[in-house]
Every structure is written in C-alpha cells, then in structure tokens.
A protein has these predicted regions:
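Conserved, short, structured surface segments that act as functional micro-motifs
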Residues: 103, 129-185
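Zn2+-dependent peptidoglycan hydrolase active-site motif and core
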Residues: 84-127, 150-154
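Solvent-exposed loop/turn segments at secondary-structure junctions
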Residues: 60-61, 80, 94-97, 108-111, ...
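Generic beta-structure capping elements
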Residues: 57, 76, 107, 118, ...
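Sec-dependent N-terminal signal peptides
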Residues: 1-14
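Surface-exposed, glycine-biased beta-strand/turn segments
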Residues: 13-100, 133, 142, 172-185
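Core beta-strand residues in small-molecule sensory/regulatory alpha/beta domains
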Residues: 74, 82, 124, 130, ...
Length: 185
C-alpha cells in the first residue's frame, strides 16, 4: 500500500495521503506536524553530525531582510547527505539560490524536505525514486549563493497539508526541533 501510494505520488502528483500511514498527524495542523516529526526519530541529514552540533538558524535574517527558512549544517565538502525519512524524490535539479538541490516528500506527501548547496548528487539519484531513511542522496557543497562561503547543507522542511504531494515553500517548518530534544529539568 505505502509503496504503491508513493509511486502514484511521484508519477501523478497530488493524491490523498495513504490511509495506512502511521504519520497522518503530519497532515493536520503545522503544530501537529511538528510534534509528530519531533517524535519520529528523523535521521540528521548530514552523516556523522550529532544533535548537539546543530544550530537553530531558522528565521535568521538574510540578504534584503528575507528570513532563513531552514537550518544550515556546516561540514566539509563531500560529506554524505542522507534522506531524513522514507519518501520519494520529487526534484533533482539546480537553481540560482540553492545551487544543486534535492526535494523529497515524506511518505504522507504532507511534508517536503529541501536539501540545497550540494556539491554533487548520489550516483543514480533521480526524480521519482523511492528512498528510505538514511539513503544517500548527495554530498555537502557550496553551490548556488553559498559559493565562496563555508560549505554546508541548507536543510528546509515545509508543511504541504493543504496540497499533499505538491512541493511548495509557503509554510516553512523549523527543522531544528525535529532533531534536538529539549532538556527537561
């Protein structure tokens, strides 16, 4: 059921989320999606990076006052980048700001993940490919508007519940709490 739904999502575009998915809370409100993502043990997208090494750079001001809709994970060029969860690759391309980028939908189609500034893609990675958590998708780089700066992965997450299966940048989610559990006193 899940595999057939992901294939349909990759080939046909927006569809209703699979009824059997254990992650349907991601298709509710943004708060519900954040809570479920934080509880779901996502893989940190850069190999070898631990939660304590992450910096919450979400909403930091960028050029022309635009907010940063992601977190940046600084690592050397060529460090492996992996899929944070099961899903489908919906874009492997380049753009002006992100350079070499990959877009992934989670298994519900209600959350999209954006990986940018890649030095290169994993061999054979292509649009429509099903991936599991931890699948190699590329390598840290400095492409796009990161050229000349420190190499890093620009990692974004987006809530797509209003149009499941259609990647859009309208509702950014802060990825930092998805990986870092707050200390309890």
């Amino acid at each position: 059921m899940l595999v057939s739904s992901l294939i349909a999502l990759a080939l046909a575009g927006p569809i209703a989320p699979p009824a059997a998915s254990a992650h349907l809370a991601r298709c509710g409100s943004e708060d519900d999606a954040m809570a479920e993502l934080a509880d779901s043990a996502l893989a940190i997208p850069v190999a070898g990076v631990q939660p304590g090494e992450l910096v919450d750079s979400f909403r930091f001001k960028r050029s022309r006052g635009r907010p940063h809709q992601a977190i940046d994970i600084l690592e050397p060029i060529g460090t492996p980048i992996v899929a944070v969860t099961d899903g489908v690759i919906v874009a492997v391309r380049t753009n002006r700001l992100g350079g070499k980028i990959v877009e992934q939908l989670d298994e519900t189609g209600c959350v999209g993940f954006y990986y940018a500034h890649l030095d290169d893609y994993a061999p054979g990675l292509e649009k429509g490919q099903l991936v599991t958590k931890g699948t190699l998708i590329g390598f840290v780089g400095d492409t796009g508007n990161a050229k000349g700066g420190p190499p890093h992965l620009h990692f974004g997450a987006y809530h797509l519940a209003d149009k499941p299966g259609k990647f859009a940048w309208k509702k950014p989610l802060n990825p930092y709490p998805m990986f870092v559990v707050p200390e309890r006193s």
